[in-house]
From Swiss-Prot:
Function of the protein: UDP-glucose-dependent glucosyltransferase catalyzing the C-glucosylation of 2-hydroxyflavanones (2-hydroxynaringenin, 2-hydroxyeriodictyol and 2-hydroxypinocembrin) and phloretin. No activity with flavanones, flavones or flavonols. Exhibits C-glycosylation activity toward 2',4',6'-trihydroxyacetophenone and phloretin using UDP-glucose as sugar donor. Can use UDP-galactose as sugar donor, but catalytic efficiency is 14-fold lower toward UDP-galactose than toward UDP-glucose.
Entry's pH dependence statement: Optimum pH is 6.5-7.0.
List of residues binding an anthocyanidin: H32, N94, G381
Protein name according to UniProt: UDP-glycosyltransferase 708C1
EC number, as in UniProt: 2.4.1.360
Outcome recorded upon mutating D382E: Decreases affinity for phloretin 2.8-fold and affinity for UDP-glucose 1.2-fold
Expression tissues: Expressed in cotyledons. Not detected in flowers, leaves, roots and hypocotyls.
Active-site residue numbers: H32 (proton acceptor), D129 (charge relay)
Taxonomy of the source species: Eukaryota, Viridiplantae, Streptophyta, Embryophyta, Tracheophyta
């Protein structure tokens, strides 16, 4: 089987002309899809000018994925779409539906060569989600595969270490050479359980990171300097390929938020707090009410994206009923309660002066590009380590003791982040560094240009 697959892509068939043909393979969920759409858009445009095939895993889970994919191909007619069908297992009680989809992708990745071999012109390289690492690196060893991780460099280090971590105790901080220790509270509990569904496919793919041509990270040199230096020194994990920061990637342009932008235009500069916990973080009704009462007491203008279900199509809640008439009216006097916004448009508005965030990595990079300070409220997964990175880089502060009865803490922290001039200056400095990194001649732009240049030789 392997012999048949590898002979489909002998090294001599790789394209060597001035327009490399690259395949971009995204994972599942908006947290994975968004950076891959940004990458595909960048690679198809100047100065990279690649022929791009974008692989879409079918079926999709959320309405947001469907909407963004449809919009993307409408605005990028030169990018070829390749659907890759996987079999989704039946829903299981207490198992994250996204984990089930991640596993189905990982288990199906070995079938990709059959689909890729039919593409024309021949492929120069693949840029893939980590879920495809084992399948691609074992069946297509002659084809350069750049694993693109959708989290921070620091959390990627932890993922790479999971094969060792799953054998260790969760009672003490995890020490990885060259890096500050990882507190156990920051590490997802499943990482200590090799039988957990997420841990099992993470281990399967992490073992094959060494066969990737490189590890691409949506971060930049000055944001995670110690981690990037340690990873590339060989002291942290000796068998990793080069770890290359290529961010923050330019985001796609969307239609402006007609309902919110006029309201924002009327607010004083840096006076609005943007509140969002991402596409996969659903809060309980009690948490939502606590946060709502805290925001109301803070007397701060805000835009709040309220989410009560992990999967958007399952979110049937009515905001007025959720908050109750009295609190809903009070909140509506000070801000906007919505189900969805164009986040990059909101963060880029001059009226927005702070971001109460779960610290999903896409949100962190979008705030970093614009120098918007973050008040971190991580919920699960990589978010606690991402919050650690945010605080260390000077982009925000991390309140580590959020709990029930948080109204007073909300009031205190919101006032702190909206009125802290030192933090605002620090965040603006991060924004300037992010802009330099992704501008022509910057460290991230140059790194990606060097990769594409190597495919033309």
């Amino acid at each position: 089987m392997m012999g048949d697959l590898t002979t489909s892509f002998p090294a001599t068939t790789l394209t060597t002309n001035d327009q490399p043909h690259v395949v971009v393979c995204s994972g599942a969920g908006m947290g994975h899809l968004t950076p891959f759409l940004n990458l595909a858009s960048a690679l198809s445009s100047a100065p990279y000018n690649c022929k791009v095939t974008l692989l879409i895993v079918i079926p999709l889970i959320t309405d947001a994925e469907s909407h963004h994919i449809s919009s993307f191909f409408s605005s990028h007619p030169t990018i070829h779409r390749l659907d890759f069908h996987v079999n989704l297992p039946a829903p299981k009680p207490n198992v994250d539906p996204f984990f089930l989809r991640y596993k189905s992708i990982s288990d199906s990745a070995h079938r990709l060569p059959v689909h890729l071999s039919a593409l024309s012109p021949p492929i120069s390289a693949v840029f893939s989600d980590f879920l495809f690492t084992q399948g691609l690196n074992t069946t297509l060893p002659h084809l350069p595969n750049y694993t693109f991780t959708t989290t921070s460099a620091r959390f990627f280090t932890l993922m790479s270490y999971v094969p060792h971590l799953a054998k260790s105790s969760s009672s003490s901080p995890v020490e990885i050479p060259g890096l500050e220790p990882f507190p156990t509270d920051n590490i997802p509990p499943p990482f200590f359980n090799p039988e957990h569904i997420f841990t099992s496919f993470t281990i399967s793919n992490a073992k094959y990171f060494s066969l990737s041509k490189g590890i691409l990270v949506n971060t930049f040199d000055s944001f995670e300097p110690e981690t990037l230096s340690a990873l590339n020194s060989g002291d942290t994990l000796s068998d990793l390929p080069p770890v290359i920061p290529i961010g923050p990637l330019n985001e796609l342009e969307h239609n402006k938020q007609e309902e919110l932008l006029p309201w924002l235009d009327q607010q004083p500069e840096k006076s609005v707090l943007y509140v969002s916990f991402g596409n996969r973080t659903a809060m309980s009704s009690d948490q939502i009410l606590e946060l709502g009462m805290g925001l109301e007491r803070s007397d701060c203008r805000f835009i709040w994206v309220v989410k009560t279900s992990k999967i958007d199509k399952d979110d049937k809640s009515e905001l007025r009923k959720l908050f109750g008439e009295e609190l809903y009216l009070k909140l509506s006097e000070k801000g906007k309660l919505v189900k969805w916004v164009n986040q990059t448009e909101i963060l880029g508005h001059t009226a927005v002066g702070g971001f109460l965030s779960h610290c999903g990595w896409n949100s962190v990079m979008e705030a970093a590009r614009r120098g918007v300070p973050i008040l971190a409220w991580p919920q699960h997964g990589d978010q606690r380590e991402n919050a650690w990175v945010v605080e260390k880089a000077g982009l925000g502060v991390w309140e580590r003791e959020w709990a029930s009865g948080i109204q007073a803490a909300i009031v205190e922290k919101v006032k702190m982040i909206m009125g802290n001039n030192d933090l605002r200056k620090s965040a603006m400095k991060v924004g300037e560094e992010a802009k330099r990194a992704c501008d022509v001649g910057g460290s991230s732009a140059t790194a990606l240009m060097n990769i594409i240049g190597s495919l033309k030789r």
